[in-house]
């Protein structure tokens, strides 16, 4: 298992000119969910990423890797800001692998998702909320 450490996401945003620094916030000892967030004065307004890996159980035979992104927004279009969340954007990605999957198969799924998210059809669907036809 990798040690929880700071992550820098660069080249993000619509124009690719945003950098986000995520700092480790700890691992929940009960469920093993690792949390990272942007340093901020108001915790509710911090951008947050959580990562968890669930082991197979008697009833569930697959490993489950979940990555969740939460981006709260505190300002209105007019630029008026207050210390409360006006809305949040979320992403929830779940990967499922059998215990017999190889690291090559898992890497293929991860890189396929990366390439898929760079495709113009998905960019239009996510950024502009336009469905495929």
From Swiss-Prot:
It is found in: Virion. Keywords: Capsid protein, RNA-binding, T=3 icosahedral capsid protein, Translation regulation, Virion. GO terms for cellular component: T=3 icosahedral viral capsid. InterPro entries: Levivir_coat, Phage_RNA-type_capsid. Pfam families: Levi_coat (PF01819). Its main location: virion. GO terms for molecular function: RNA binding; structural molecule activity. One of its GO terms (biological process) is regulation of translation. The record marks 90 as: RNA-binding. Capsid protein self-assembles to form an icosahedral capsid with a T=3 symmetry, about 26 nm in diameter, and consisting of 89 capsid proteins dimers (178 capsid proteins). Involved in viral genome encapsidation through the interaction between a capsid protein dimer and the multiple packaging signals present in the RNA genome. Binding of the capsid proteins to the viral RNA induces a conformational change required for efficient T=3 shell formation. The capsid also contains 1 copy of the A2 maturation protein. Acts as a translational repressor of viral replicase synthesis late in infection. This latter function is the result of capsid protein interaction with an RNA hairpin which contains the replicase ribosome-binding site. Belongs to the Leviviricetes capsid protein family. Homodimer. The capsid protein dimer binds to the viral RNA via an operator hairpin, but also many other RNA sequences in the viral genome. This is Capsid protein. It comes from Qbeta virus (strain MX1).
């Amino acid at each position: 298992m990798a040690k929880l450490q700071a992550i820098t996401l660069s080249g993000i945003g619509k124009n690719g000119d945003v950098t986000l620094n995520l700092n480790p916030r700890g691992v929940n000892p009960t469920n093993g969910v690792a949390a990272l967030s942007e340093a901020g004065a108001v915790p509710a307004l911090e951008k947050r990423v959580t990562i968890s890996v669930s082991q197979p159980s008697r009833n569930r035979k697959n490993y489950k890797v979940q990555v969740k992104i939460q981006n709260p927004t505190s300002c209105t279009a007019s630029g008026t800001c207050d210390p409360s969340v006006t809305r949040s954007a979320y992403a929830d990605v779940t990967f499922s692998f059998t215990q017999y999957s190889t690291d090559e198969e898992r890497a293929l799924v991860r890189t396929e998702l990366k390439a898929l998210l760079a495709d113009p059809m998905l960019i239009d669907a996510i950024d502009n909320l336009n469905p495929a036809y």
